[in-house]
Amino acid sequence: MADARRRYSDDVPDDVEDRLRSMCLALPETYEERAWVGTRWMVRRRTFAPVLGVQDAPPGPSVLLAFRSTGDELEVLRNAGHPFFVLGWGRDALGMVLDDRTDWDEVRELVIESYCTMAPKKLAALVEP
């Protein structure tokens, strides 16, 4: 998500962070920590869902969630357009703008898929879709 032209911040609304926290910490062996900017949720020292603010994103400040995806869904999301975008690092890394139109059921599915992509297979097998 790093882009030298952007001003990143920890400015993520509490309700957004709380929703993500609830989703992420419900997954096996996950934990939360402060990232270089924003917050990230991890499994076994691997980040699966960082969230942060971007102050100078067009059309104005935005909140971004990064996640991992695979297979057909990865290709669909790469080409879907707003609110999705390619991060520019990692072949399976995507981002999503979180705003008042966000479909939180979809976010939950994406967070679970990202977790299953990053978690050891034994932990991923414990997750119900």
Q: Could you tell me what each predicted segment is?
A:
Residues 1-129:
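Charge-dense, helix-prone N-terminal extensions
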